Amino acid sequence: MGVYALNAHAVASRAAQGWLVLDVDAHDKSPSDPQGGIPRDYSKIGDTNRETCYFLHMYLRDSRVLDYLLTRPDWDGKTIVLMGTSQGGQQSLMLAGLRPEKISAVLVCVPAGTDLDADLHGRKAGFPNWPSDNPDVMRTALYFDPVNFARHIQAPVLAAFGFIDTVSPPAGIWTALNQIPGPVEPLPMIESEHNNLTPEKEQNWAVRSEEVLEALRRGEAFRPRTMK
């Protein structure tokens, strides 16, 4: 996944709708420094041990962000929505499973990092494409894989996936969704690759995620639509 600056405009737009918003950088860097010295191959750092893996502190930062939001006097005391695309979707699924009692809804688009041992089961693995022939790496991968957290998710989930996405293959996303015990709304984007290169390809996600957010903003429950 790329290393880039946070989108202040997107956060301001959500705030204008009445949301208390916190955009979380996946990396430990200053907002004023888009690259922050993060190496291009950061996903390989410490990948043979879960205590040294780069993703450990990424996940811990997410949890601490939630701790902070829960202390805000302007929080309504009940609604926490996790929303993200690609690696942001990966972190959203993880946090929903790590802190299930706090989360109201999860909205993810092409979540990365799922089904990391897919190569061993006849499926295509996606980012971070860790080597499946290294047992130590695979043990680490399965610990950080959102599939490992999905079985603990209690909140309703909206999950969009592109049928021609090779970064976050749809089979891997389904593997995670199948572990979630609660209600899930799969949202297929049939002609979409990773990160939806045109507005038309991501139309399903754009429309449905806004519908869900608006319902939640009005204080209504998100009730996922099941596939027929």
Which residues does each predicted region cover?
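Gly/Ser-rich "nucleophile elbow"/oxyanion-hole loop immediately N-terminal to the catalytic nucleophile
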Residues: Y42-S86, I103
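Hydrolase active-site cap/lid region
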Residues: G89-D136, P188, N196-P199
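Short beta-strand/loop motif that positions the catalytic acidic residue
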Residues: I153, A159-F161
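Short alpha-helix in the alpha/beta-hydrolase fold that links the catalytic acid
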Residues: A155, P169-N178
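Cap/lid segment of the alpha/beta-hydrolase catalytic domain
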Residues: L6-L60, A118-A125
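Active-site nucleophile elbow and catalytic-triad environment of alpha/beta-hydrolase enzymes
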Residues: P135-F149
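Acidic catalytic loop of the alpha/beta-hydrolase fold
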Residues: F163-S168, N195
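C-terminal catalytic histidine-bearing segment of alpha/beta-hydrolase fold enzymes
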Residues: T175-K228
